[in-house]
Design a protein with these regions (language model features):
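Bacterial Sec-dependent N-terminal signal peptides
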Residues: 1-27
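Non-catalytic cap/lid and distal C-terminal segments of serine-dependent acyl enzymes
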Residues: 22-283
């Protein structure tokens, strides 16, 4: 009996020591307790169909039941979905770390603009109007552009800058990670022709839907961050966008570092984007 009791106490003590060591190892990580992740379907009147999105609330949303919070919209790339970011990155920890609501909508293969040829792909209206209105009416968010940001990867980087540059009254801050910011350089890729038409016969439409060609319309005031890797196939067009913004005297952050068109790069880059937005929200 004494041997059994001693063995039990030893196992209990060892378990407590293991737990203590584990707790020390994660002491610097964000503790996520009350965070809520919703998967919602938002009805688009423009497209006459529902579009899904993931909404991530921070712990603070529950700790402070009367407070409102900034919102960050995070867009996926081509061939992706609204599930990509929550699957690849701990968005709950990010939401709690910065005290923000994060929204990851489905963009299908839309390039996040309103297609001039396909009424079922009107994603600029969805992102910049219908989705924002839904989020602001269902969650405790600040309803002004200063406290609203948008970013994304690849096609989503294009979409984030496209929507922000065209709607500065909606998004006060914006970012891009490995963004396809000049679609005219890639006329036979990623179903873009299904959204605008064949490049050879619709060159003007392609030019009008390229982010880089929006630069002459911009005014200083938005907080802009652009991020890409040296080994990315979008590296050159991002450098061109950086130069265009400099020539137009539009303030922005531009980061180039080792990396390619990979999730390894984006899951690292999102941390810098979120820090940038947090500083903008605090101004």
């Amino acid at each position: 009996m004494k041997r059994k009791l001693f063995a039990y106490l030893f196992v209990l003590f060892a378990g407590e020591m293991t737990l203590a060591c584990a707790q020390q190892n994660v002491a610097t990580q964000v503790k996520v307790v009350n965070v809520q992740t919703d998967t919602v379907e938002v009805m688009s009147q423009k497209m006459n169909r529902g579009i899904k999105a993931v909404v991530v609330l921070p712990n603070q949303h529950f700790d402070n039941p009367t407070d409102s919070f900034p919102t960050v919209y995070v867009l996926h790339g081509a061939w992706g979905s609204y599930r990509d970011w929550p699957t690849k990155k701990n968005m709950e920890a990010i939401a709690t770390k910065y005290g923000v609501v994060i929204v990851c909508p489905d963009g299908q293969d839309s390039w996040y603009f309103d297609s001039p040829i396909d009424p079922k792909f009107q994603f600029e209206t969805f992102i910049s109007k219908e989705l924002v209105e839904y989020v602001d009416s269902h969650y405790r968010t600040f309803r002004n552009p200063k406290m609203r940001a948008i970013t994304g990867l690849s096609m989503g980087g294009h979409g984030a800058l496209w929507n922000a540059f065209r709607h500065p009254d909606v998004f006060g801050s914006c970012g891009s990670m490995s963004g396809g910011v000049d679609i005219t350089k890639f006329p036979n890729k990623w179903k873009i022709d299904q959204r605008i038409g064949k490049y050879e016969t619709n060159k003007q439409a392609w030019a009008e839907h390229a982010v880089i060609n929006l630069v002459p319309t911009l005014k200083a005031g938005q907080n802009i961050i652009i991020d890409d890797g040296y080994s990315d196939f979008f590296y050159e067009v991002n450098c061109n966008l950086h130069k265009a913004l400099l020539d137009a005297k539009i303030p922005h952050d531009f980061t180039i570092r080792p990396g390619a068109h990979t999730w390894e790069y984006w899951t690292n880059a999102i941390d810098y984007q979120m820090l940038f937005f947090a500083k903008a929200f605090a101004k």
